[in-house]
Amino acid sequence: LSTEVAVTEHDIVAAATGRPHIELTTEAAQIRELRAAIEGNQLPDLYVTSGEVVHLERVSGDISTPLGLPDPPPLPYAPSVLTSAGLASLLARHAYAFQVRTRTRKGKNGESDETIEQEIETVPSNRVLAAVLAGRYWPGVRPLHGIVGSPVLRPDGTLLQTAGYDAKTGLFFAPKVELPWVPAEPKLLEVAEAQKFLCETLLGGFPWVAPADRANYLGLLVSNILRPYVRTLTPFGLITATTQASGKTILSEGIGLLYGQRVLPWPETESELRKAITSALGEAASVLVFDNLREGTVIDSPNLALLLTTPEWSDRRLGTNTTVQIANDRLWLGTGNNLRLGGDIATRTVLVRLDPKMPHPEERTGFAIPHLDLWVKDPANQRTVLRHLLVLVMDWIASGAPRAEHVMRQFTPWARAVGGFLAHHNIDGFLANVDEVRAMDDEDNEWEVFLGQWHRKFESKPKTAAQIRASADIDIDNHGRPHDPWEGCFLADERGGVPSAKSLGRTLRGQVGRFHGPYVLRRGEDPHRKIATWSVGCPDGP
């Protein structure tokens, strides 16, 4: 028994030209045909992300800068959600969509009428195109989990270094610079050269405050390569200095230009920050930098704190009422002078500090690479840095990828992997400046001072908010001079004065059980008056 499959003329032409031929008949048939073409990967460069079909294409042109210099796009490719217009464009360029129209030619001189069929190239109506794209289930369409501009480490420990789509990870590798192949087991000489170049030649001239700052920077530098392997979030990288021209932007560009960056201004409000985050995550940039924050800025943002600990960012798509969900698979950096931290940001931050200890740091010498600010912008030099970094990564993998014992809240897998990588290459000091990070949290410092004075005055005796507030009233000593019984350590309200008992009670409720230094606030209840009482505990005290 045999079955014959009819081969049409259009099948033959489609095979010869590489363009599928799609006959457009009824609307229902058109929807089925076009969905089949998408699910059968007959149209190029289509992928699915979070249930939406996206088209991945090259980015043309540069962004003009105020100086007229080109600012290249973060990555040479970018995805966009496929719209009706986008699908029509793809069909026109990569398929032959047609309708068959018939007309009758009247016969002359007694001849019979002639029916003529004619193919008309066309595209479906907007209603059909919208119906095709309405679904969220796309079997057969390759998932796109992200675009990377450098080789990355797959979950199995192999290095993705072939340009294009990688089925093992769902990533599309769009190289920013061409690299020679990196072996799975680099030679010892290669490893030694890479260590010396990165630690001495590239970074040796920076005025690090302590070894921890250089180690933390190298940890941030390697994070994008390790991300698919470690499969975890990365903390906020804060690069701060005592004065301008210390090298902050060179360091941030050293990371961002390697992987593809977008530089952002620091928004003034939480709503503006949320919009900036959503917009930035929609771009094909692996590193997002809040550059040159105003000196002394206190980074205390609930939205940033949420972003750093959520693998998927959810927000309303700009200009619409629809919600967009975007993978938070980026490295976030901030730079500025004498920056401070507040809220939950300190526990989500890796600190890099610079202190040139001179009045005009722009005049200093000693860099092994002259004009380093220009050097890092050259793709050939980015290739050099990336090659050395990858050699160290593969040497670490070849040695079993040993982990360190660091603990860092939600970022512990990242800290253990990066710490192990650095320790393997004898780079000391990673995360050793945690105390300095805590000291940058002004709010935490204020609470520690307040609770410490409370504990010295009342030990762990329960007090009501009204009693605590009354204890802050200014006394007059025997010489008629005002005396502050709290010695300036009491909490202040928004106007800088002492808060009311009611306001103080509300403030205390938000701090129950949270340690500030060695002190912790506890809540109780007066059994007779049925009102809240407060006490301060200390591990070294009662």
Model regions: which residues?
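Conserved catalytic/switch belt of AAA+ P-loop NTPases
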Residues: 301-324
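AAA+/SF3 P-loop NTPase mechanochemical coupling elements
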Residues: 277, 281, 316-335
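Phosphate-sensing "switch" segment of ASCE/P-loop ATPases
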Residues: 163, 170-191, 200-201, 326-330, ...
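Glycine-rich phosphate-binding P-loop
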Residues: 235-260
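Pre-Walker A (Motif I) flank of P-loop NTPase domains
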Residues: 232-237, 285-286
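N-terminal pre-Walker A segment at the start of P-loop NTPase domains
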Residues: 211-225
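DNA transaction DNA-binding modules
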Residues: 240-243, 261-262, 274-278, 286, ...
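N-terminal nucleic-acid engagement/recognition segments and initiation subdomains in replication
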Residues: 1-212, 229, 276, 280-282, ...
